[in-house]
């Protein structure tokens, strides 16, 4: 058993049997066909039940997050529990408006018809979530499924077994299995779930696993929402307020110890402010977490040994200029800045999902300074005392200015889930206009997800579909176009043999 108990729980957690998966899937389909979930009063009642359950189980959820992730109560509440309860309250207030049949304009050629847009639930849905925000990323989509009128199967991650078990118990106490149920287990359980014919699959995870989900969904033409990740760039221009940038970036990168799908992944920084930023970043990490970050209860650990080994493995891809301390027993990794990184190294091609930050320096002319080539022998990662020989590193040039180099760099890679720019707001809008990402911030990081009034989602390799607020309701709904035509008059021009075609052609 590890310090947080994860290994023991993974060995003893019972996988949901295939027979039970099939049975519950069929029961939920039959329950949906009964029409009970369609009633707006039923949906509101179920949302209120979920809200009451969240409030009742809050302390158990927070304790479980501490056990699995070393996530403090404050961070658990702010980044997980309160986001779900806030979403529930928002849906209770607005689902009546969202679900209402809406009148649409009818052109003259449809006279005497009335046109409507009608929302209907997609049906029986599957929601699969990852381990990094195991409460928020499983239950937030569920809110949309309930408000839309769907039945749902929830599949939490086996890597956070304590949280997954608490959620299973909470859902079982709150809802009937024929309405909402939780399935537990490993990839074999996932495979059995994906074999079923769902009316929609909502998946949060990696792009690699998303391809498996899409392949399974394609067999039945099942629609999907994919909330993925990627390498979200953080640009620091020379006009940036370095003190503010360092504080916000340090917070965003250490939140959940960098295990956030929209965490800033790598830094593209103007050479004139690079040294000042490194010093300010180090100071802000100390301000946030104290002189000995290992003693800070707000600093989250890596989810398991595999994640710890993967993230610390990135240290060899460059030279550490800040941080670098680790503790394998507790899976602690200090916030770490690394420079002289090969642009084709794993550190610059894989989503980091940890508190390690590659720093790429660019000058006024758009020259990327000193990126090591992957074929050269890597320097030993021993803090800032290690510097590569000049023969090992060579500058790369991108024509034009700093901003043009940034744009070229970002657009040459997969579209990220988030994009962050620090500098003049006008320049930020220019860079955003010429790049593509799921969302982003100017002079901030991560906070775009905190506004429940705007949708959240990826683009390209970082995902498809949107949720949060009305977008969650829309994600689990089908939009129908309905025309109701009066019978008191029947205009003849649409009927064969089109005797009025000349007149109709002039009108149309």
Kindly give the residue locations of the regions a language model identified:
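Residue-level signal for inorganic ion chemistry
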Residues: 43, 88, 149, 180, ...
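Rossmann-like NAD(P) dinucleotide-binding subdomain of oxidoreductase/dehydrogenase enzymes
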Residues: 108-244
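Structural signal for hydrophobic packing residues in well-ordered secondary-structure cores
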Residues: 36, 51-54, 58, 69, ...
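N-terminal amphipathic/basic-hydrophobic helices that include classical n-h-c signal peptides
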Residues: 1-11, 374-389, 393-394
């Amino acid at each position: 058993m590890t310090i947080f108990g994860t290994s023991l729980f993974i060995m003893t957690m019972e996988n949901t049997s295939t027979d039970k998966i099939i049975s519950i899937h069929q029961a939920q389909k039959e329950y949906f066909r009964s029409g009970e979930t369609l009633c707006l009063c039923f949906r509101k009642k179920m949302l209120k039940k979920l809200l009451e359950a969240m409030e009742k189980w809050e302390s158990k959820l927070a304790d479980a997050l501490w056990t699995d992730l070393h996530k403090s109560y404050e961070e658990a509440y702010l980044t997980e529990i309160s986001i779900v309860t806030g979403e529930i309250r928002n849906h209770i207030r607005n689902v009546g408006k969202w679900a209402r049949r809406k009148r649409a304009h009818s052109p003259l050629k449809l006279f005497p018809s009335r046109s409507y847009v009608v929302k209907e639930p997609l049906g029986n849905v599957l929601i699969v979530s990852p381990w990094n925000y195991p409460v928020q990323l499983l239950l937030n989509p569920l809110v949309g499924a309930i408000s839309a009128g769907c039945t749902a199967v929830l599949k939490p991650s086996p890597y956070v077994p304590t949280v997954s078990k608490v959620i299973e118990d909470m859902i079982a106490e709150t809802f009937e299995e024929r309405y909402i149920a939780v399935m537990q287990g490993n990839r074999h359980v996932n495979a059995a779930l994906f074999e079923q014919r769902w009316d929609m699959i909502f998946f949060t995870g990696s792009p690699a696993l998303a391809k498996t989900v899409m392949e399974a969904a394609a067999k039945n033409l099942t629609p999907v929402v994919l909330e993925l990740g990627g390498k979200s760039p953080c640009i620091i221009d020379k006009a940036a307020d370095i003190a503010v940038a360092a504080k916000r970036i340090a917070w965003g990168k250490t939140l959940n110890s960098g295990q956030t799908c929209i965490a800033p992944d790598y830094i593209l920084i103007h050479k004139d402010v690079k040294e000042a930023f490194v010093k300010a970043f180090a100071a802000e990490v100390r301000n946030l977490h104290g002189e000995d970050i290992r003693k800070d209860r707000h600093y989250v650990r890596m989810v398991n040994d595999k994640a710890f080994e993967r993230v610390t493995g990135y240290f060899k891809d460059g030279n550490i200029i800040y941080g670098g301390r680790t503790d394998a027993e507790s899976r602690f990794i200090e916030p770490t800045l690394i420079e002289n990184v090969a642009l084709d190294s794993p550190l610059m091609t894989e989503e980091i999902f940890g508190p390690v930050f590659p720093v790429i320096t660019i000058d006024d002319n758009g020259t990327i300074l000193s990126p090591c080539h992957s074929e050269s022998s890597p320097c030993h990662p021993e803090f800032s005392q290690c510097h590569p020989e000049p023969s090992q590193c060579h500058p790369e040039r991108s024509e034009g200015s700093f901003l043009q180099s940034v744009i070229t760099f970002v657009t040459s890679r997969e579209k990220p889930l988030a994009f962050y720019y620090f500098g003049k707001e006008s320049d930020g809008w220019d860079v955003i206009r010429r790049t593509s990402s799921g969302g982003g911030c100017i002079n901030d990081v991560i906070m775009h997800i905190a506004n429940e009034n705007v949708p959240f989602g990826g683009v390209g390799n970082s995902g498809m579909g949107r949720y949060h607020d009305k977008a969650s309701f829309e994600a689990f709904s089908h939009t129908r176009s309905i025309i109701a035509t009066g019978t008191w008059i029947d205009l003849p021009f649409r009927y064969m043999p089109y005797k009025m075609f000349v007149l109709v052609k002039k009108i149309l």
